[in-house]
From Swiss-Prot, chain A:
Belongs to the acyl carrier protein (ACP) family. GO terms for biological process: lipid A biosynthetic process. SUPFAM superfamilies: ACP-like (SSF47336). It comes from Gluconacetobacter diazotrophicus (strain ATCC 49037 / DSM 5601 / CCUG 37298 / CIP 103539 / LMG 7603 / PAl5). InterPro entries: ACP (IPR003231), ACP-like_sf (IPR036736), PP-bd_ACP (IPR009081), Ppantetheine_attach_site (IPR006162). 4'-phosphopantetheine is transferred from CoA to a specific serine of apo-ACP by AcpS. This modification is essential for activity because fatty acids are bound in thioester linkage to the sulfhydryl of the prosthetic group. Pathway: Lipid metabolism; fatty acid biosynthesis. This is Acyl carrier protein.
Amino acid sequence: MSEIADKVKKIVVEHLGVEESKVTPEASFIDDLGADSLDTVELVMAFEEAFSVEIPEDAAEKIATVKDAIDYIEKQKAA
Amino acid sequence: MFRLDGKIALVTGASGGIGAAIARTLHGQGATVILSGTRQAVLDSVAAQIAPDGARAHVCPADLSDPAAADALVAAAEAAAGAPLDILVNNAGLTRDGLAIRMKDEDWNRVMEVDLAAPFRLCRAALKGMLRRRAGRIVSIASIVGITGNAGQANYSAAKAGMIGMSKSLAQEAGARGVTVNVVAPGFVQTAMTDVLAEAQREKLLAGIPLGRMGQPDDIAAAVAYLVSNEAGWITGTTLNVNGGMAMP
């Protein structure tokens, strides 16, 4: 697993207070990890801060799963 | 009841009559207060009156007409207190009165900027931490004219009505995290802002107040102290009218 993936996972565990084993790439923040809409906004803000990236609103809306977040951040970092 | 021991409270416009009373009251209830405003010397003297020994009182000047200053103030207040913010009191405000047909854009814009945009920016900055910590209290000081309107105050009454609507929205957004957002709408309070009224105007206003007197800054401060207390934890999105009965919306 990449460094980015590890860090994303850690943020999700910390923020949503879920068990690490549940934070699989396919896990949906809302459907599987019990996040509400405010949690997803806070997660995006936490990612922005942790990775020094800006995630615009239309991109943030598409980040539904752990993998979505990792992919988006990896793409930004590679660019 | 209503103790605020250990709480960190930022009060904007703390150099004014109502703001100073709010800061003094919250400090008296045990809170650490951060006094903000544009006039450093006045803030220093208010802080010295509130806490002669300097304990639990800090001064963080800011000019809220500068968008960056509003964003930076929450961080500066937390740095001064050495702890995250529990309470935000949006009290700073100004008036640029005039009949609408003669009101200049700059008078409209300045009131919107300082009385509505700056409180929004402060709420936004404070909410980030409050939501994360799952606790917090925001009280914004609006005005009776935000509900009733007032000839000569199209800008001020629009900004204060806006503050009420904004607070209801924020209350809905923040409720799931235990953060409450409320408004206190003062009526006719004796301050520098109302001292400029002519005697005839004053008498006419007094005739419309069932409780028969002008408000004192402490009347407003007591309402704020209640809304920021733990005991008011099931009140959010409301506007508490503190006006001697002048309007009963």
